């Protein structure tokens, strides 16, 4: 913008430079293992550009460059880099209108993060105010202070909530592998009350969280020794001043968020067990357990599956019955993860600790492939729910109900990101009136409900179905996954159906 103001380049020149940069960014890729590919469908590289936001005196930070960046991303319509807009209550109205217009183009950008929840959360963790107001998105939905953050802001392992629940119900033995995962706290068929089950969950998820930290710390130490990242360290404050690489504790801040998969499946499973088994006694513990092991295949077990799916409140519908159950169960994990510092703790950075985060990327597909049937009626090896979004086909009361459910999560503790995917058809935004309704819906989610994040897939179901059948006809179709956009033809055959 300085060069434009000084007459060295025109606005059109700046727009061309940015579009060339985005095209160059798209050429970066890397070869991944099969397991990594399942967790990162579409070959994302996680570059993220952030615009919008506010200054420390709460003035809107939108400027002419914000519009140019938005225009350049809309013009190229590529999958990289990601574009994130920092929303706040006083965001420029014209700029926000333009953001909605770009969303309507249907390539999943921009995503929206909420300053009103993220900035206070950072400050509570010890981030200086001026740095908290300068945060940006990194990767998918994670947030960090640019140029001052540790070498990773998110976890290297996933806690598969539904699989942990099944393990808790089976005295610590994993039903997929047959291996003992934890000490064991009883069998479901012998648990007399819902509170007994919840106690087993609490102990099991804490134990699994501890194991995940042990694994991550081992990886961190090996990475510190073998991959020092000298160039990255030279560009990060205060590595040179401390004489340490970013992996030795040279950064100003160093926080890591844990990752979880299947939050909604866990919620719906707990609701099904509590309501149908313990309260209404429509299903015995033995019947439910046998139905799970049978993958709901027999005629009798198919009827049980129908009850689990249709006769129980579901996460995503603003029903306190199930929403409060997930908050209670989730708190066990959030309370445990914060106990474990990372390997840079007390080596220089502010922080050096862990907090929650729900960025599952596309691991809900791979993790689902290793998880047998679950008490919510999901069949064995099907994908799990991603991020903080409802399970597939579970939300029946519209987007407002989904927003109200997600807002009940302890967002202030989940600083690593509360990822929410929403879907709309292009026809729903075909009129100015409907566009304004979407804008008001987002404002309500952020201003009144204090949501963390939302992103949209605006593409018709018919287009997605045809892309499945005839991918060669849709090579330019871009859809949003858990925190990033990718060409539909780059997804595995398992990932695209989860977007449907």
Regions found by a protein language model. Name each.
Residues 1-494, 500:
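Conserved catalytic cores of very large enzyme subunits
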């Amino acid at each position: 913008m300085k060069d434009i103001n000084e007459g060295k380049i025109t606005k059109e020149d700046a727009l061309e430079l940015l579009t060339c940069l985005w095209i160059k960014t798209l050429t970066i890729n890397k070869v991944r293992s099969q397991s990594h590919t399942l967790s990162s469908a579409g070959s994302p590289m996680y570059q993220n550009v952030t615009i919008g936001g506010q200054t420390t005196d709460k003035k809107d930070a939108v400027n002419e460059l914000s519009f140019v960046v938005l225009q350049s991303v809309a013009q190229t319509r590529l999958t990289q880099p990601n574009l994130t807009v920092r929303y706040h209550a006083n965001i420029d109205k014209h700029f926000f209108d333009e953001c909605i217009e770009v969303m309507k183009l249907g390539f999943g950008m921009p995503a929206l993060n909420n300053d009103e929840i993220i900035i206070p959360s950072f400050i509570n963790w010890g981030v200086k105010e001026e740095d908290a107001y300068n945060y940006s998105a990194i990767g998918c939905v994670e947030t960090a202070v640019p140029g001052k953050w540790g070498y990773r802001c998110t976890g290297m392992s996933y806690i598969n909530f539904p699989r942990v629940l099944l393990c808790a119900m089976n005295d610590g033995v994993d039903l997929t592998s047959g291996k003992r995962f934890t000490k064991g706290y009883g069998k479901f068929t012998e648990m007399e009350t819902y509170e007994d089950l919840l106690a087993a969950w609490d102990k099991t998820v804490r134990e699994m969280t501890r194991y995940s930290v042990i694994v991550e710390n081992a990886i961190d130490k090996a990475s510190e020794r073998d991959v020092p990242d000298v160039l990255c360290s030279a560009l990060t404050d205060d590595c040179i001043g401390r004489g340490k690489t970013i992996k030795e504790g040279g950064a100003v801040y160093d926080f890591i968020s844990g990752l979880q998969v299947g939050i909604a499946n866990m919620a719906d499973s707990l609701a099904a067990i509590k309501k149908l088994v313990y309260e209404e006694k429509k299903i015995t513990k033995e019947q439910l357990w046998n139905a799970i092991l049978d993958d709901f295949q027999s005629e009798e077990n198919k009827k049980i599956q129908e009850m689990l799916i249709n006769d129980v409140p579901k996460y995503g519908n603003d029903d306190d019955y199930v929403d409060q159950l997930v908050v209670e169960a989730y708190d066990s994990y959030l309370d445990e993860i914060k106990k474990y510092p990372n390997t840079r703790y007390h080596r220089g950075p502010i922080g050096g600790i862990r907090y929650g985060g729900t960025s599952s990327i596309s691991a809900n597909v791979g993790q689902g492939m290793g998880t047998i049937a679950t008490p919510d009626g999901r069949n064995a090896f099907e994908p799990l729910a991603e991020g903080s979004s409802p399970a597939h086909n579970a939300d029946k009361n519209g987007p407002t109900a989904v927003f109200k459910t997600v807002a009940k999560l302890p967002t202030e503790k989940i600083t690593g990101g509360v990822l929410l995917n929403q879907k709309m058809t292009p026809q729903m935004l075909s009129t100015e009136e409907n566009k304004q309704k979407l804008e008001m819906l987002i404002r309500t989610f952020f201003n009144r409900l204090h949501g963390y994040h939302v992103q949209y897939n605006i593409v018709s179901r018919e287009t997605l179905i045809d892309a499945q059948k005839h991918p060669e006809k849709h090579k330019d179709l871009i859809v949003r996954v858990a925190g990033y956009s990718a060409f539909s033809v780059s997804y595995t055959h398992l990932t695209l159906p989860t977007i449907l």
